[in-house]
Amino acid sequence: METMLDRLLTQAGACAWGVADGGAVLAVMPGDARARALEQVPGLKRLLCAAFPYARGDEERGPISLYARGEDYHSVLRRRMEPVQRALEEHFPREIFAFFSDISPFPEVYAAALAGVGKLGENGLLITPTAGSYVFLATLATGAALPVTGDGHIRRCRGCGACKKHCPAG
């Protein structure tokens, strides 16, 4: 299963991916968000989290965030994750695979960190080994018992402060 997922997600353009235990993610969510999540994905067991890098581009083009200069990333991520979702639906025909990116009842950064996709930065963003925090997160929530990739612990950055120093919000 991991080999298939690695192949599919690499083809989709993900720089990192992992699978978090749904119960561990639900445990940190407030009751209303947990209820919404379980309405959308009954029998939730796992969250497949994938990080997709975005171009850093030319920072001299004005005060517009780099990610906002291209096509809407929600559409891009949905398109990139469709082959992954279809393959999983074929492999697990009785299970739901619900796509989320940003607009989600799940704490996606927490889930991705729990899955081992990256470390949690002091700025609250996920920091991946190859793209830093310049990533978009996509999640497939499912009742399928995919193998969990994380060890159940959140890795945090070493506290160098670089993310805070370079944060445009101060």
Q: Where do the protein language model's features map onto the residues?
A:
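Auxiliary alpha/beta "docking" domains used to position bulky ligands
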Residues: 1-156
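Iron-sulfur cluster-binding cysteine motifs and their immediate structural context
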Residues: 162-170
